[in-house]
Amino acid sequence: MSDSEVSNMSDSGSEDGSISNKSQRSARSKSRSRSRSGSRGSRSVSRSRSRSQSGHSRSGSESPQRRDNRGKSDESGEEEEEPPGEDIDSEEYDEEENDDHPRKKKKKERFGGFIIDEAEVDDEVDEDDEWEEGANEIGIVGNEIDELGPTARDIEIRRRGTNLWDTQKEDEIEEYLRKKYADESIAKRHFGDGGEEMSDEITQQTLLPGIKDPNLWMVKCRIGEEKATALLLMRKYLTYLNTDDPLQIKSIIAPEGVKGYIYLEAYKQTHVKTCIDNVGNLRMGKWKQEMVPIKEMTDVLKVVKEQVGLKVKQWVRLKRGLYKDDIAQVDYVDLAQNQVHLKLLPRIDYTRMRGALRTTATESDDSKRKKKRRPAAKPFDPEAVRAIGGEVHSDGDFLLFEGNRYSRKGFLYKNFTMSAILSDGVKPTLAELERFEESPEEVNLEIMGTVKDDPTMAHSFSMGDNVEVCVGDLENLQAKIVAIDGTMITVMPKHQDLKDPLIFKASELRKYFKTGDHARVLAGRYEGETGLIIRVEPTRVVLVSDLTNHELEVLPRDLQLCSDVATGVDCLGQFQWGDMVQLDSQNVGVIVRLERENFHVLGMNGKCIECKPTALHKRKENRHTVALDADQNQIRRRDVVKVMEGPHAGRSGEIKHLYRSLAFLHCRMYTENGGIFVCKTRHLQLAGGSKTTVSNAGIVGGLGFMSPRIQSPMHPSGGRGARGGARGGRGGFRVTRDREILGKTIKISGGPYKGAVGIVKDATESTARVELHTSCQTISVDRNHIAIVGVTGKEGSVSTYGRTPARTPGYGAQTPSYTAAGSKTPLVGSQTPNWDTDTRTPYGTMTPSHDGSMTPRHGAWDPTANTTPARNNDFDYSLEEPSPSPGYNPSTPGYQMTSQFAPQTPGTLYGSDRSYSPFNPSPSPAPSPYPVGYMNTPSPSTYSPNTPGGIPQSPYNPQTPGASLDSSMGDWCTTDIEVRIHTHDDTDLVGQTGIIRTVSNGVCSVFLRQEDRSVSIVSEHLAPVLPCNGDEFKIIYGDDRESVGRVLSKDGDVFVCRINEEIKLLPINFLCKMKSID
């Protein structure tokens, strides 16, 4: 139990408790006042006795003498008792008690003498100094210091220090010291008597936070909720204030310029965690609170007054009011009035009547108008003002209207307060400069506000830029930037006499460009685009964009040299490049170019317009939209088509969008509008589509017969054309699906997707729908341009022309019917009058119609074979000879074109034991024409990949007879090459040379220079013109097909050529002369 606790127990009246030190000190003080002249030894004995009594009090015993002293102290009254812990200076407190109680003071005077009074006065004057010196010497606890001749004063000082340590608590000692030095100013203690005269800056140093002050803790907060969170924590603090567990934070700080953080003042981090617990806005800072260093704590609350340094002709913007966000130029600055005189474009409502023209009706109309209607910014027009009743007065060089001053050029000059303008980092756009100045060349683009937060943002210079000095003695000196340090630029001069780097301010330099440089736009309307500089002016640079080939006018400060080419922006918000958008209720368009603020939209009329994103609505398309091309083929999105008529005739492209009778196409070879153009669907032709016309469809569908040239699969178009006639009797233009190729992996060997690999999703006789592996895109491809991966042979090995042998008149004797049954079972051929046994036709008793081995070759299928001469476009021999002929021998079951085509029927492919007809061929009249067409019967031979005339022994891989002849025809033809017409029906054309303009399905459009016209000629009538030394050529065969080069020399059967800066040897027949430029 401590001494103070024992003292408290004795004060409460306990008889058995120990006597407090306070009572002992009171008793000793009284005895000392009565016998102050006692010897040093008596004091030592008293001090020893006091310590022994204190030790006895800790054990709980009490001597009779101490009880007597306690009784004497009790007699003096309870008001004379001192509170525990304040008897550090007993004499000082005794005198205070004497002032309050004269009776005690009289007792002190009764026993005092002259020498004692002097000692007491001396003690009162030097009491603090003695205590201070004693404390410094003994360090408050001086029990182990040897007493080397101590005086009475030294002993008393030691006694006081000992009592201070033994009897008082730490907080009581701290309170005593604070009271003792409270009357002395901090400045006086640190700086002596002259501290009061110190400056405020020096005295403020003493108020800086120290290690004993609360710390600042930085807590992450939700951005924008800093002040609201601080108020929330204040309410939480007040709520917990009267509870058992109040919050231990001292303050909350949410500085104005700090985003995403607040500061809490507290002694410990745990106090901060308790405070921010369950606060949603501080969820991000729950696990991490960063303590601010002591030296940086003052910077949190430091307020720096910004000095506005405006310059004349500096660009600024208005913050509020009618001219909010408008560009303005500083005319002069009035710092005394805190105002700035600006020059800007006025906003005057020329529709509101003024003066005498203002009537009651106009006032009522004005009240109905929107209050915050903002007129357009344009130069002041005095004539327009007078027209609405306004009065314009002249004041020297200015015009006065409604209290405002206008220049003769139409600009408004007006005073604004400093707080109403924004001057930091203002950069006017080129459009604003053109409207702001009558002559843009006079505009000073370099005067603008600087950004104080980041000095590097005050300029757009970067390493390696070419600059020139614009002010000073070295004006017009060209240099190259080698280092940048804030606003200080280090450059290497381009001068023979200057070899050392020079340092300039950023305001003293400007960028320098020359014609032919490749640069990137850093800011403005065309930000991110690259192009080639074609013209340099003092205040602007003109360059051609790499993406659009349009001229761009850019400020020099917004350019930077670069070597790469921009890829462009393909999306902005909800819109992307190539999207179809709704312009109005009747018109649509396609986005062909995206800029920062505007879209370039290609309309239905083929014109490109600029639109704001807010004025457009994205149109939702149906992916199943279908239209008809010029040949009445169905076309849909992603189909590859060719333009046959109109301004874009000859171009090929992919359908991006279909809208009513219009199609938006994308062509990689078209440079304008991003490669997108619009055409009418009736001007298009599907790549690989049918050429069946409406007139032919009617004839074929009704009669079922066509000429051999059209009907025979020898010609690809003929085979496709016969499809309508064969289906005419049962549903007209029904499309036959080729299920045998579905799901197979193929490779495209021609067209715009040459080399692509995909899976066949759907197929007809002429077209296949292929899903590409690379882009998962489904496209339509001509069947002649695909080859099955893993199958040897040329493309077209999967033939569509041989599935119905009856369609080929030349093979009627070899393959009697659609199936092999006609040649194997005579009963069928002799008893079945038609395909279906239940078909009761008037022709049932006629010659068997399906047993082709008993009829002439063409008799069963084409009544015109022996009567009408056929065209000789497809064969070297003549078809005009009467039947029988060497080319068409009706007595021979096979096709006697050449020996390499051995006769074979489709039945042998499927294990037929008898693949020929047992009946000998005999001439018989052709059957009467049937009024309807024929349907394919589902049999294996219907989808036979091998047809007559195409056996594996042939050098042509299994394919249709027509494909075997036409497989190599027209493959070499391409555009912009010179060709010679070696054969043609028109003898006047034979021998002429021309230039191929377009190629479509083996038909070339050739421009004849002699006749100055274009003719359409089948590619088989053309021959390439060989180049000579020095001529440009184009490769027409091989892996490098379509490559362009120049002939250097000829060495036998090869040419020495230069292609892309490489020297190569190429065969003669691989090259064709390109068109010569006259």
From Swiss-Prot:
Cleaved signal peptide residues: none
InterPro entries the UniProt entry points to: KOW, KOW_Spt5_1, KOW_Spt5_2, KOW_Spt5_3, KOW_Spt5_4, KOW_Spt5_5, KOW_Spt5_6, NGN-domain
Subcellular location: Nucleus; Chromosome
Modified sites of kind Phosphoserine: 73, 76, 90, 707
Segments of this protein annotated with the region Interaction with RNA polymerase II: 350-461
Acidic residues bias: start-end ranges: 76-99, 117-135
Annotated protein name in UniProt: Transcription elongation factor SPT5
Gene this protein is translated from: Spt5
